[in-house]
Amino acid sequence: MIAESGMSKGGFFHHFPTKAALLLGLFDRLTSAVAASVEHSVRDGTSPPARSLRAQIRLAFDKPPRERERNRALVMALVVGVMESTEVAARARKANRRALATARAEGVDAGTALVIQLALDGYFLGEAFKTIKLERDDREALRATLHTLVDATSTRPARHGRAHKETRP
């Protein structure tokens, strides 16, 4: 890991004096990759509504194999981090809440945002643990289905405040 970082051993341990600091750094790197993908979508002006969820879908499906392998390693580090550090777990929960709030603000209903987020989480974990290896057709089918869900519900930005509750007769 030290060699891949390009730092000296002393510099590495200066930035990450504890295992918890290293795990937090890895978590920050993973969340930064997602944030950068979203920002790129915003800057290029081609993003339709629900751009944050669309960016997460792109992150899961459109990266070359080498980048996906790097993401796999980061996801594995995140799993370890969440298991070993309450601070990493708290940051992960906060990042998930923020992602769901962003999707809601972009016009995606709560249920759809949760389904997409949990499907992507499951896909990332399945790839990370190597318990799933989708063939190209299956990957494309999953990707298309997630986009269909986004398209079906992302019509207008959500209002701030309490979520709309369905009324029953």
Annotate each predicted stretch with a short phrase.
Residues 1-21, 25:
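Helix-turn-helix
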Residues 17-21, 25-28, 43, 47, ...:
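Residues in soluble alpha-helical coiled-coils and helical-bundle/repeat scaffolds
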Residues 55-57, 72-76, 82, 88-95:
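Hydrophobic alpha-helical segments that drive targeting, anchoring, or assembly
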Residues 28-34:
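Short, basic, alpha-helical segments at the C-terminal edge of helix-turn-helix-like DNA-binding modules
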Residues 68, 86-93, 97-169:
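Hydrophobic/aromatic-rich alpha-helical bundle segments in the mid-to-C-terminal region
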Residues 37-74:
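Hydrophobic alpha-helical connector segments
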Residues 56-60, 75-79, 116-123:
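Short alpha-helical scaffolding segments that buttress acidic/His motifs in well-ordered protein cores
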